[in-house]
Amino acid sequence: MKAKDIAMASDKIILYIHGKGGNATEADGYRSILPEYDIIGIDYDDSFPSAAKRDIQAAYDKLARRYSHISVLANSIGAYFAMLALQDRKVSKAALISPILDIERLICDMMLWAGVTEEILEKQGGIPTTFGETLSYKYLCYVRDNPICWTVPTEILYAEKDNLTSRNTVEQFVSSHNAHLTVMENGEHWFHTDEQLNF
């Protein structure tokens, strides 16, 4: 992120944190629907949670020197990284799209899909899967050792057919946090069709 990338239209900015395979330029798509905010997207190292946390905190700290109101817009696993990185920072509000809210549950689900037990994962350290993810025991331990305490007012956009976060998981999160849930019927985890994007 460079200083020239940050417009100074107001004292309010949204920090956009993309999901897996995304990039900072996705933030551009939100400018027309959120004209009262400056919006900046960041790219970050998503290879391990602590690396993502470091990069997101650095971006936040830079913005905090120039903006008095920082909100967060995050997508998919970007939501997990945002909450991990910014739970101790002053965030005005958050909007999470198809968020990964319980990363430990997702990892355990992926282990089940791959037919991998925790004992096997611990012994081997890392195991590639047929669905494109590499299971990591170190990653799982980090998640367990670094719980999140999220108190930011949060809006969640959830797709009815999300295959990564269950409806039960999102409803449990909403009931125990200062959060509001909007569900798109027949939506998928990846909001990509015209109908889904317009929603």
Residue ranges of predicted features:
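Short, surface-exposed alpha-helical segments at coil->helix boundaries
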Residues: 24-31, 50-53, 167-171
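Glycine-rich phosphate-binding loop signature in dinucleotide/nucleotide-binding domains
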Residues: 9, 63-68, 150
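Alpha/beta-hydrolase active-site loop
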Residues: 26, 47-65
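Short hydrophobic segments within beta-strands
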Residues: 15-20, 73, 97, 157
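The alpha/beta-hydrolase serine catalytic core
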Residues: 90-199
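Aromatic pocket-lining residues of Rossmann-like dinucleotide-binding sites
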Residues: 85-86
